[in-house]
Regions:
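Helicase-associated low-complexity/disordered flanking segments
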Residues: 33-89, 93-96, 305-330
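Conserved P-loop/Walker A NTP-binding site and adjacent catalytic elements of P-loop NTPases
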Residues: 70-72, 77-254, 261, 279-284, ...
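Conserved C-terminal RecA-like helicase domain
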Residues: 126-128, 136, 143-152, 288-362, ...
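Conserved two-lobed SF2 helicase motor
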Residues: 163-179, 334-345, 354-374
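Conserved interdomain hinge at the start of the Helicase C-terminal
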Residues: 261-285, 292, 349-357
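Non-catalytic terminal extensions of ATP-dependent helicases
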Residues: 337, 357, 449-804, 809, ...
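Conserved segment of the helicase C-terminal RecA-like domain
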Residues: 379, 386-387, 394-435
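Compact beta-sheet-dominated globular domain cores
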Residues: 857-892
């Protein structure tokens, strides 16, 4: 029994080890004692810094902190749930906390309390999440709560105020800090959000390592779907000597009602809307299915005239680009949203903001709903209970189901949330056929049941009921050992001590591989893996060992000095720096080759590469047919055709050479590809490129890749390696991304410039309209590349004699006649690097227009022909791209 004095009265808490700690007499001060009536989205949004930091008691006083925190919460219109009260109390008592409560029970407010308690005690706290977008969102939230001077962020792409007392980061960032600094790392308190990622086979190690290493820190482990974590909690208590409190099994503030529907999806949506169960989030397990469903629902009267008018007023000035943007524009004006990871960020935020304002009655999306998006939902409609996990189709796990289903029901608005599972399509058709036959035996005998497709993984009411009743599966450990992790451990202060010393490299590595959450067989495998990696590092000369035997005198030291952000940034950046030295700066292809090196270090954008390969194979088949190659040989040759891989042979040899002295790099795969280069060489804009490869459903992924390439090029390529052409290329890429959707680069720029006081772009009350794209003409270097690309595209088409495409671009330029005249004088049009050089373009600048001439490179070197055009600067500013009006192909 522990007695804890509070300012106004006493309450008593009984501690039952391994169980949720409930108060025998949980009599808090009046300021902490009332039950919440309405919490809503406000608990995780808009916590403005109107006094929390200034209210924190200094010196630390637990009683005063509880009252101050409650006063601040009330000033924000919030009242704590009993579960929140209990969780905050455990934090004040300086215990670890496992917080496994349903969605809508205010876990984010408990996280704020954890950071506030640490700040009040002069301690340093970390917030971790699985996605950079969630880290960024939480950063802006905490900046509003604690002020920009108290909050920092580190994501690997960028960092702002990294020495702040509160740091937001991805789980991998904290894991690497733990590996490199050990128990003495400057980490006093850790809030791990979405802790169920602990079981992720690829990334789960990053959630486990801090628990194993940071023995001084207090941990808050949060998720709505943790399952049984008693083993993890017991191990944490053993390692740290600090008790673990568990707040779990809390009743949802908005209960859920479940039903299984054997009704066509469109008809079911109409029923749900008629029953007043909007907004409805329809869960699909592919992006294509989500878009197709939304388009199918466009024929349904989802929104009333008044609702459509309100939507039109909200989105009136929003710029929807060609392609998917125009499709989305039509859908949202009908009250239907689409939400998935392949969309442009500004489109996703538009849908989220319209939904938060209650303007969208239906949102068709993917199961990303379960991780971090803030869309208020009354009803979750699951179109299936199976998904493809990258290897096979399988039924949803209990955790996956509850992650999504738990989002139904809006606290403060709904008395209950609805979760509806749709039967398989063939079963729905069979049910309709049976219903149509009625009770007529003859008609029923004629009904031919439709079979499930071959290989179909089915589900039914029993599957649904099992998922409803099932607790989330126990979290399975997924620790691993890599060369990069081993180097981090070997670089820890004191690691070069004799093997018998507690902090020596031998002891540190042994402790990690022998004392973790893995079963015995896996621990033995980790130990063997660590030994093999160590031998590789010694052979490469990265590690030196002095002494040996079993007398405990052996010492280990690294022979290389690691950069400060080793393994925190793009892991192949050091290789890229070395590979740049292999290029000839005088080569006309130097700029594109340098970009190809950067691209080879980035993650593969699989949808883009698949479409590149598909198109390349289609063109190859057409060419082989024209050459009369037989079918069998064509099929054999096709196997060798893939997406473009510039410098592949050079980079593969360089990679092997680099890995011989830096073996840790083998943990990261080199992947030559050409997306930025392909885009530039084709002289296309973003919309043209998306349309060319039919990537409308993945344009967000295309933009994310281009933005990653831009950041990597800016950060990795040193200034002394940047020629004028390479600077032009990088500036063009940045401007292209910015004009399509500036949110990615603006947010990154704000962070890297230290603008920590930037407002939260994710807030529900943020403007629906995105910030206007910057003036495309203001960056002369980038704008000039846009102009040159427009002209170069005409050169390419003219070289291929594609009159129809040129006429489509410039109907009044007289292309057919001009090309006839040109080819009477010359046999070909050059398209090599020299033909595209800056020397081949002449510009006469006027205040509102440029006169430009693209000189054609002919075989004789006469350079007497050129494309004359005018650049309209005002129109370019309006459209966010170079508006080039071609007058024609003319001879001097």
């Amino acid at each position: 029994m522990v007695r804890f004095p509070l300012t106004e009265r006493l309450f008593v808490v009984r501690h039952d080890r391994g169980a949720s700690r409930r108060a025998d007499r949980f009599r808090l001060p009046p300021a902490l004692g009332t039950r919440i009536r309405s919490i809503g989205v406000r608990q995780t949004r808009g916590m403005a810094s109107d006094g929390l930091t200034s209210r924190l008691p200094r010196p630390w006083d637990p009683d005063a902190f509880l009252v101050a925190f409650d006063d601040w919460a009330r000033s924000r219109g919030l009242t704590l749930y009993p579960a929140q009260e209990e969780a905050v109390l455990e934090l004040v008592l300086d215990r670890h906390l496992v917080l496994s409560t349903p969605t809508g029970t205010g876990k984010s407010l408990v996280a704020v309390a954890a950071h506030a308690a640490a700040l009040a005690q002069g301690r340093r706290s970390y917030y971790t999440a699985p996605l950079k977008a969630l880290v960024s969102e939480k950063f802006f939230d905490l900046v509003e709560t604690f002020g920009p001077e108290n909050v920092g962020m580190v994501t690997g792409d960028s960092s702002v105020n990294p020495d702040a007392p509160i740091v937001c980061c991805t789980a991998e960032i904290l894991a690497n800090i733990a590996l490199r600094r050990g128990p003495d790392a400057d980490v006093d308190s850790v809030v791990m959000d979405e802790f169920h990622f602990y079981a992720d086979p690829e990334r789960g190690w990053a959630w486990q390592v801090p628990l194993l290493v940071l023995s001084r820190a207090r941990f808050v482990l949060m998720s709505a779907t943790l399952g049984d974590v008693s083993a993890i909690a017991s191990d944490l208590e053993r390692r740290t000597g600090r008790e673990v409190a568990r707040v779990t099994g809390v009743e949802r503030p908005v209960p859920l009602h479940y039903r299984y529907a054997v009704t066509p999806a469109q008809e079911l949506v109409e029923q749900l809307l008629a029953e007043g169960l909007a907004p409805v989030y329809i869960v699909h397990f592919s992006q294509a299915a989500a878009v197709e469903r939304a388009q199918a629902l466009a024929s349904v009267r989802v929104a009333s005239r008044e609702q459509r008018d309100a939507i039109a007023a909200a989105v009136g000035g929003f710029r929807f680009s060609a392609g998917f943007g125009q499709t989305l524009g039509r859908l949202v004006r009908s009250g239907i949203g689409v939400h998935h990871a392949g969309m442009l960020p500004r489109y996703r935020r538009l849908v989220e903001q319209l939904a938060q304002q209650g303007l969208l009655r239906v949102v068709c999306g993917t199961d990303t709903l379960g991780v971090g998006i803030n869309v208020p939902i009354r009803t979750v409609l699951l179109t299936g209970l199976t998904k493809f996990d990258g290897t096979r189709m399988r039924q949803l796990t209990a955790r996956e189901f509850h992650q999504v289903a738990g989002r139904a029901g809006r606290a403060g608005f709904d008395t209950q949330g609805e979760v509806v599972a749709l039967a398989p399509e063939h079963e729905i058709e069979n049910a309709r056929a049976a219903a149509k036959a009625g009770d007529d035996p003859k008609a029923r005998r004629k009904v031919v049941k439709k079979k499930a497709p071959d290989g179909f993984v089915s589900w039914g009411p029993a599957s649904f009921e099992r998922l409803i009743a099932a607790e989330p599966e126990p979290l399975a450990s997924s620790l691993r050992m890599t060369a990069a992790m081993l180097i981090q451990l070997l670089s820890r202060p004191g690691a070069d001590a004799p093997a018998s010393a507690p902090g020596s490299a031998f002891r540190v590595v042994r402790d990690l591989v022998r004392d973790n959450h893995e079963p015995a067989a896996r621990r033995a495998a980790l130990a063997r893996r660590a030994i093999a990696l160590y031998r590789t590092l010694r052979t490469a000369g990265v590690v030196e060992q002095s002494g040996g035997g079993f007398d405990g005198t052996a010492r280990v030291r690294l022979t290389v000095e690691l950069q400060a952000d080793f393994a925190l940034n793009q892991p192949l950046s050091p290789f890229a720096l070395a590979a740049l030295e292999l290029l000839d700066r005088d080569s006309p292809d130097y700029a594109l080759d340098a970009m190809s090196i950067i691209e080879a270090t980035l993650d593969d954008p699989r949808p883009i590469l698949s479409q590149q390969e598909f198109r390349a194979r289609g063109e190859a088949v057409a060419a082989m047919k024209a050459d009369g190659i037989e079918y069998e040989e064509r099929m054999e040759l096709l196997e060798e055709i893939t997406w473009p891989k510039p410098l592949a042979e050079l980079l593969e040899h360089a990679y092997e050479t680099f890995a011989s002295s830096q073996p840790w790099i083998r943990d990261f795969e080199l992947s030559p590809k050409s997306v930025v280069r392909d885009l530039y060489e084709r002289a296309m804009g973003f919309a043209d490129y998306v349309a060319f490869y039919q990537l409308g459903r993945s344009e967000g992924l295309v933009l994310r890749y281009l933005s990653d390439a831009y950041r990597a090029a800016r950060q990795t390529i040193p200034d002394e390696a940047k020629t004028d052409e390479l600077r032009d290329l990088i500036e063009w890429l940045g401007e292209l991304v910015r004009q399509v959707d500036s949110s990615l680069l603006d947010e990154w720029a704000a962070l890297t410039d230290g603008a920590g006081s930037a407002s939260d772009p994710h807030r529900a009350d943020a403007a629906v309209l995105p910030p206007a794209a910057p003036d495309v003409t203001r960056n002369r270097r980038a704008f000039l590349v846009l102009v040159r690309n427009e002209l170069w595209r005409r050169v390419q088409l003219a070289a291929l004699q594609r009159d129809d495409e040129l006429v489509a671009l410039d109907p009044d330029a007289g292309w057919p006649e001009a090309l006839d005249a040109y080819y009477d004088a010359h046999d070909a049009i050059g398209t090599g690097a020299s033909a595209r050089s800056a020397a081949r373009i002449l510009i006469t600048e006027h205040p509102e227009r440029w006169q430009v001439r693209q000189i054609i490179e002919d075989p004789e070197g006469d350079h007497d022909w050129g494309i004359d055009a005018e650049v309209d600067l005002a129109a370019s500013r309006d459209e966010g791209t170079a508006v080039v009006r071609v007058a024609g192909l003319n001879r001097l």
